[in-house]
Amino acid sequence: MKFSENWLRTFVNPPLSTRDLAHALTMAGLEVESVEPVAPAFHKVVVAEVLSVQKHPDADHLQVCKVKTGAAGNDEPLQIVCGAANVRAGIKVPCALSGAQLPGMAIKQTRIRGVESTGMLCSAKELGLEDASSGLLLLSPDAPVGTDFRAYYDLEDNLLTLKLTPNRGDCLGLSGIAREVAAITSQNRQSVEIKPVSAQIAETLAIHVDAATACPLYCGRVVRGISLDVATPQWMVQRLERSGLRAINPVVDVTNYVMLETGQPLHAFDLARIQGGLAGSIHIRFARPGESIELLNGENLVLQPDMLVIADDAKPLALAGIMGGNESGVTSGAVDLFLESAFFSPGVIAGKSFSLGFSSDSAYRFERGVDFGATRAAMERATDLILNICGGRVGPVTELRGSLPARDPIRLGLERVGRVLGVELDEGRVAELLHRLQFGFLNTDAVFYVTPPTYRFDLAIEEDLIEELARMYGYNRIAATMPRAKLDILSAPETRRTRSRLRQILVARDYQEVINYAFVETSWETELAGNRTPIALKNPLSNQLAVMRSSLLGGLISNLQFNLNRKQSRIRLFEIGGCFQKDGQTYSQQEKLAGLCYGDVVEEQWGLPARPVDFYDAKADIEALLWPGELRVAAARHPALHPGKSAEISIDGRIGGFLGELHPRWQQKLGLARSVVLFELNVDVLLARTLPQASEISKYPPIRRDIAVLVPKDVSVQAILDSMRSEKLSIISEIALFDVYQGKGVESDKKSLAFRMLLQDTEKTLTDAQADQVVAKLISVLENRFGARLRS
């Protein structure tokens, strides 16, 4: 919110410098982002009138002007050479006199192409008021000649820009900011006197509110016989421009001015462009299928059923609370108006502007909530200004009122105030602070019942009121103390892991966490994730971030390239984040954990030989995440992974994700010199934790037996391990694979698998015969199920 300091001081004028005023606002929670002067320093510039213009005798693009400046009581015209295209007799412009100091230049009497010039007629750019200008700055015909230009143009002013939080929509108007300044500084606020404008004609336009929940308050009135041949007053144009708005025409300028002054957006329709004119009607309703509208910004919009519109009997005229339509806007030929002031429910407007890809001042205010208690007053204020500037006659106000937001009293206890703030405020002090805030209240027995004003949508609970007291009391006056609130520390369930624990494990195993956008390239989704129906964004940040991700792998690969381009050779990354799927018209979100490994297993060192990371290193990292859960892998295909080096992961019997090396096609496409190992897991499955079971530690020595079996090449190790473990032989404490061999001495269709077994009893020392009997049983199982045989 940008505004003029001088305009603010017409409402409330505290005895504070600009700097102190900005500091006071910031300390009260209304951060002043910037303070800048309206104009740079310059002097000896006055309001002047061009009396005559003649061609320069020696330059086609120059004019020799006689200029009346009235400076220091001198009525003698000055001769000034000017090259501006818009110079002509009769205009009033700023004139820099000889000796004037302008931004970046000094003015002195000189000769230009042989003609004497004793000053300079100025453009807005030359005075530092604009970055660019096409000609002289033209002033109002009634500007008093000889007046110091800085005083006439009110340039002893500063522009303040507030960085408002979303809950403070009440400060999106000068009256709201003035209310805050008055409360902060304990000053009186001067309100604009708004008197109801009496109807001069009986004509009205029928209004039908078909969406009463979305529009619980709507005011409209007819204004006839206006003239747009007049100019918007200079003071209004200045205030608009200093708030970041340009002047368009008197009616539009008035509606914008009242919005800046009160925070209430208004809209004016050309009555002649409404279907049926006075015989027609206005409808506030939701859009119908197939309807469209061309907005004032030139955008053609196909309307959706959740969009609220202002319509006549034939078509939508405006996107309610956001922007008017081009077909019904007020242009230079308008004579009759229909003026609108309304309250639209914030939830109906919120997010619409963003989804459409543009913003508007109206939407910015309505989605935060405007003061429905001032809707009628804003209408009267705009009517009065239009009549004073454009003339005309007005009809009565038609007001349709439905169920407006309730203003239920909020309980505020002094004991709670002291406990939260750490400052003891007595009843009188709290009452004084609430009076400064203009909050209505009743109090009894150290308890206040405060009714939120109609302009404060952010007040709902006791803590909101305590925050208001803290702002008025002064955050800087509250001493630092230890919290006094009671804390109940809940015990974490042992059957659930935490996300922080998952992060700790991976960081301990040399991974670094990354956080990527949830938006990715379309090709990543269709090719890398195998998602043929990605969720497209209506308003993407860029073409490279056009769809929602269903997998985290694309972001990790992008991170890999980023690090490789910066000469990193050993990279381990992980991310925990949301992924999004579309199934028909249904959308779902799933949280996933993904990891990426590239380069050597360990940093280069003298004690260990270099070895590139592989499938089994990543598998070990996943097992560390899951301990003491049971991990199973089974060969499976994934579009991003190597068809012969990828697997599906099951966690305690539930499908949990996948693991494998990056597909050679992608490795070549990305120009990667080494293999990349990737995994992606379902976080919900990871968080479920199997409780460790206590078991007796045997005091008897274990017996180790190693066996090597020949099995068909297509038999997986996992299948063999599952078969041996399924026998549930109590004395077997461990079975592990320690060697795989194919080559000389082994048939081409076979492979040799060597397993280590530890056998141990908790009650006695095992004999060799007992151990051999158990091993023989397992060998028999493998022979029967897989055609395995012992390798001699």
UniProtKB/Swiss-Prot annotation:
Cofactor: how bound: Binds 2 magnesium ions per tetramer.
Entry-linked CDD domains: PheRS_beta_core, tRNA_bind_bactPheRS
GO term, biological process aspect, one: phenylalanyl-tRNA aminoacylation
A GO-annotated cellular component: phenylalanine-tRNA ligase complex
Cellular location(s): Cytoplasm
Entry GO MF terms: ATP binding; magnesium ion binding; phenylalanine-tRNA ligase activity; tRNA binding
Enzyme class per UniProt: ligase
Organism domain of life: Bacteria
Keyword RNA-binding part of the UniProt annotation: yes
Quaternary structure note: Tetramer of two alpha and two beta subunits.
Taxonomic source organism: Nitrosospira multiformis (strain ATCC 25196 / NCIMB 11849 / C 71)
Binding site for Mg(2+): 458, 464, 467-468
Keywords for this protein: Aminoacyl-tRNA synthetase, ATP-binding, Cytoplasm, Ligase, Magnesium, Metal-binding, Nucleotide-binding, Protein biosynthesis, RNA-binding, tRNA-binding
The name this protein goes by in its record: Phenylalanine--tRNA ligase beta subunit
